[in-house]
UniProtKB/Swiss-Prot annotation:
Binds 1 heme b (iron(II)-protoporphyrin IX) group per dimer. One of its GO terms (biological process) is hydrogen peroxide catabolic process. The lineage of its organism: Bacteria, Thermotogati, Thermotogota, Thermotogae, Thermotogales. It comes from Pseudothermotoga lettingae (strain ATCC BAA-301 / DSM 14385 / NBRC 107922 / TMO) (Thermotoga lettingae). Formation of the three residue Trp-Tyr-Met cross-link is important for the catalase, but not the peroxidase activity of the enzyme. The gene is katG. This is Catalase-peroxidase. Signal peptide: none annotated. The keyword Iron applies. Homodimer or homotetramer.
Amino acid sequence: MKSKERKSRKRWITDWWPNRLNLKILRQNCSDSNPYGSDYDYLKEVKTLDVDAVIEDLKKLMKTSQDWWPADFGHYGPLFIRLSWHSAGSYRIHDGRGGAKNGSIRFPARINWPDNINLDKAIRLLWPIKKKYGKKLSWADLIILAGTVALQDMGVKILGFSLGREDVFEADESPDWGAEQEMLSGKERFKEGELEKPFAATEMGLIYVNPEGPMGNPDPSGSAKEIRLAFTRMGMNDEETVALIAGGHSFGKCHGAGPSKDLGPDPSSSPIEQMGLGWKYTYKTGKASDTYTSGFEVIWSSKPTKFGIQYLKFLLEFEWELEKSPDGKNQWVAKNAPEMIPDPFDPNKKHKPRMLTADLALKFDPIYSKIAKKFLENPEEFEKAFAWAWFKLTHRDMGPKSCYIGPYVPREEFIWQDPLPKRDYELIDEEDIEYLKKQILNSGINISQLVYTAWSSASTYRDSDRRGGANGARIRLRPMNLWEVNHPDDLIKIIKVYEKIQKNFNEEQKNNKKVSIADLIVLGGCAAIESAAKKAGFDIRVPFIPGRVDALQDQVEEEFYREIEPFADGFRNYFKDPYKIDESDISTTPEYFLIDKAQLLKLTVPELVVIVGGLRVLGAVYSYKNYGVLTHTVGTLTNDFFVNLLDMNIEWKQIDEHRYLFEGFNRKTKEPEFKATRVDLIFAHHDELRAVAEVYASDDEKEKFVSDFIKTWDKVMTLDRFDLKV
């Protein structure tokens, strides 16, 4: 038979089995994907950057219009502000994902969103700056710096700026952006009437809300409700919301010169000869006065390259009439107003003031309107509020202030940075550490409780916005001490024991040496693991570096920590809502949320497997009910979890209606052996997880299991120790 040249499309594993648990997010952005290599240290390189030289280069670039993409009003500042805003503005507090921390706006999905049309041009305009400074300046930092410098160049007294955002070199697939099948739809996220978590945007492909109004309906009051919902979900209050919208819309314009039918595909779908640029517009020239971005033709101010209160003045003082843009979209024009707004390219042409439905929301919502009037009457207060809100918008996923770099880091510290007291005492030494371990192990707290409490404290960390973690011991403070998964009644007793040990130790010291509760919680886990390893025949030291401090209650952003209370935690075998499991949708299952949490903890697949196996045999599971504790020697650090999970002499059967709980029976005796959840069984069911589990179940890898578990434990315990990385 003659061979035929292939013309059919390749089908990937995910095409055949779309509901298979995907581990890809645990493998993305490894050191091998970074072209600078594993020895490259951006945080070291950026400290050698001449920031002032970059700022001057940016100011010059902003006022040098390029023929291939001409600048509105002769200034790219408004475009760069939009780029910075949309890079940072996709952040949401529920999982800390999105945001500006890694420059992922350069990649799908975000670069292809309809809300980000033509931001690919803004990034290309910045390429000469990036090219000049190379490895000393990341795209992530440059994108935020460009918008901040633009504000400064157009009259805003900025609060400050920090460097320190490290680039990724591949698309970030960890965020769940929604289940909608088409852009600018919100059907799935509002399926049950309320916006599902973790979403902040009200429609697919937007960073906040539809500027035309809810689902395109020009209803300012309805728009205000959506704005409040979206901005609250990204951690902004009402005053910050008004300041950001009014400040941001002081600059630039919306573009909708012609019909959307002439707009080409997004960057990822565009023809190869366009070199990664998308949205080619074939209406007239397709640029300058003929540009299409949002479909609206709106200029808010008569001075669109200068900061001021004119946006607020026009918004509140004019009456507004509904009209259609050239693309047929709903927008508003000032009633009986003169043509006073300059054209971005024709000096002989003027326009009437225009607004979006989302702008009028600030006028018709009683709370927003009151704030807007206050800002109009107090311009200096408005400018300060905008500068502070901009700083929060562009920095809130960078973590604590100790992560900030550069000459323009502000002195102020903010509650959203998880501030900590400055240590004013000497740290404990090796002799003290051994003494305190003995005190903890003899305190009456068992191994399971010690490990569970330490893990509960440290695993609150999430790398998406570098919040949470063991430093500060916020687990002992509201609201984390009330989280169901943290065993509140048990936790308060354990903390009291630690406080007694702390008090006795500190009072015994003749010098200024002290120990914090935060350090004791982690040390307790380390001591318990050493004891458990010794029972298994391994005399091994668990790394511990003191230096954590104890946060005060007023250093806890309570609203934030209430919002992020977990409803699922596979590491501790906790799942609040088993009735929501739908096996036809993997994203509803606890094993899906386990992978999601593992990514936030920066765990690889082997690290995920080994840490779960160790936590199980140590009995560190929710309510200590022994689900997943596949061993007869609880508190001994063995590989029993994997051995028994992979034992073909055990048959597993569902024991609840939700298919969450299972029981393992001896195939011969029919007697029950163990209980487990879906999270446990996934390590034998999923082929890739099983492949790793088989390594740790092997007879010759018992020591490797202990060693790898301790390495992973130490990694999680120190994820938030930025003081060690400075």
